[in-house]
A protein has these predicted regions:
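Active-site neighborhoods and metal-handling regions in enzymes and metal-associated proteins
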Residues: 1-466
Length: 466
């Protein structure tokens, strides 16, 4: 938790941006693994609740009466039975005091607060809910059916939250740096362990254990797979094989709920083959190009398409692609190899604030998403970069057998793709290199003081260490 003043200042700015009405920010509740008496999944508080109210306990709601400048933390104190099973926790009053809030109330009072506001036709601002228990709570409080809540959520509040959370403060950057330290240890552990004979799940389990051992948790389920062509492939009991590539996409989340998100691709044997090195070097060049051009004022969509053109040019040199590069990228031919965007916002969420709808987070009135074209419709971040933004830089090249077959059968982008050559890469897998990047005053820099090896020689050298 940050200082009391941090949360006071954040709520003050939020009130100024929203202007009037009643703001309700729901914290999360415990989520059972399958049924409540059989245990709960690790608790994760709603990020916007954490941002403005700081408390990492279930069953809390923050209410801000903007017009009357009244802030209230709503929740019930635990009873003796809960204390017996789970131990004592701070009272709601104490938690409110820790973040500079003067008023508290039990959960049953929230219905009265909402009824009073509605009777006076005051605007009630809430964010789009993503959990069913919160959707049902909103239905009970405001009478808005769950199917309508996304549309009824306050755009004014969404835009205010996005504006504030998009630009990271100095203390937030410090937390992201802490997450990066743990992320470094997670990824270098994976590199040291990767060798023929182990299972994907074994390596992934060791990676997860690093996060836990530092008092953190994983920022998303760890991806460790020899099938790197599957974007979000789960680790399996497959045994690591000589000659294959292993892709590790993993990150840590600190005790204050700030994340890291990195991806590395490594040769199981410890040495890249010539063919692997050719593709890897293209991804490496695209990754480094982003670092050269990303800076305040630049549209990240422009960086994405510049990377696509660079990638396509280099794939033409290998005989995998052909034709005019500009026309090919305009037609979406690059999505055969890169069917996702260059990156996304990152912070308290790995895909930061995407619960507020990507069109509100990664885009704006100037830069709009293309939802029609395959691949381009997965571009999560397109708007102009600003100092203090944190984005991921994650180009990749994937050889997806089903996609190759589909496009070949349809003749899709046939004037730009050499399908005969692509057939010979169906067993290749995929390569992705991902880092977290802070936009600075005049450019950008990596988050994290120690670089996870990613240049081919550095990867091979690191994997060769005992």
């Amino acid at each position: 938790m940050f200082s009391k003043d941090t949360y006071i200042k954040r709520r003050k700015e939020l009130k100024e941006l929203v202007g009037s009405g009643v703001i309700i920010i729901f914290g999360n509740n415990e989520s059972p693994c399958n049924f409540p008496n059989n245990g709960y999944a690790p608790f994760r508080q709603d990020s916007s609740f954490l941002y403005y109210f700081g408390q990492n306990r279930d069953g809390l709601v923050g209410v801000i009466d903007v017009d009357n400048d009244i802030e209230t933390l709503i929740g019930d104190d635990i009873d003796i039975e809960d204390i017996v099973w789970y131990g004592s926790v701070d009272s709601v009053h104490d938690m409110a005091e820790q973040v500079g809030i003067q008023n508290t109330a039990p959960m049953k009072s929230l219905k009265t607060i909402c009824n009073n506001a509605m009777s006076k036709k005051r605007k009630i601002h809430f964010l789009p809910p993503y959990r069913w228990d919160i959707k049902l709570q909103i239905f009970d409080l405001l009478g808005i059916h769950p199917n309508q809540q996304k549309e009824e959520a306050s755009l004014t509040l969404i835009q205010a939250v996005v504006k504030m959370r998009s630009t990271k403060s100095a203390e937030e950057i410090e937390e992201l740096e802490r997450a990066a330290v743990i992320g470094y240890k997670m990824h270098t552990t994976a590199m040291r362990l990767t060798r023929p004979g182990l299972t994907e799940k074994y390596v992934a389990g060791q990676v997860d254990g690093i996060a836990n051992s530092y008092g953190a948790m994983v920022s998303f389920p760890t991806i460790f797979t020899q099938h790197g062509e599957i974007m979000h492939g789960n680790p399996s009991m497959n045994i690591l094989q000589e000659g294959r590539l292993a892709l590790c996409d993993a990150g840590a989340e600190t005790i204050n709920n700030y994340c890291s998100d990195n991806t590395r691709t490594m040769p199981v044997s410890g040495k890249f083959t010539q063919r692997q090195l050719e593709i890897y070097s293209i991804v490496e060049a695209c990754h480094d190009y982003t670092l050269e051009v990303a800076k305040p004022g630049v549209k990240y969509a422009d960086v994405h398409f510049a990377v696509c053109r660079l990638m396509f040019d280099k794939l033409k040199e290998l005989g995998l692609a052909k034709g005019d590069t500009e026309e090919a990228v305009r037609a979406g031919a690059h999505a055969m190899f890169l069917p996702h965007g260059l990156g996304h916002m990152m912070g308290m969420d790995v895909h930061d604030m995407e619960n507020l709808d990507q069109i509100n987070v990664g885009f704006d009135e100037e830069v709009r998403p293309n939802l029609e074209q395959f691949g381009t419709n997965c571009l999560r971040m397109g708007r102009r970069l600003q100092e203090g933004f944190v984005v991921t830089d994650e180009p990749g090249i994937y050889f997806i057998p089903a996609l190759i077959d589909d496009w070949k059968a349809k003749g899709h982008c046939a004037e730009f793709l050499n399908f005969d050559k692509l057939e010979t890469y169906k067993d290749f897998g995929g390569i992705r290199i991902e880092d977290d990047v802070l936009i600075t005053k005049n450019g950008c820099r990596f988050i994290g003081k120690a670089r996870i090896p990613y240049h081919p020689k550095d990867v091979e050298e690191f994997m060769g260490k005992e």
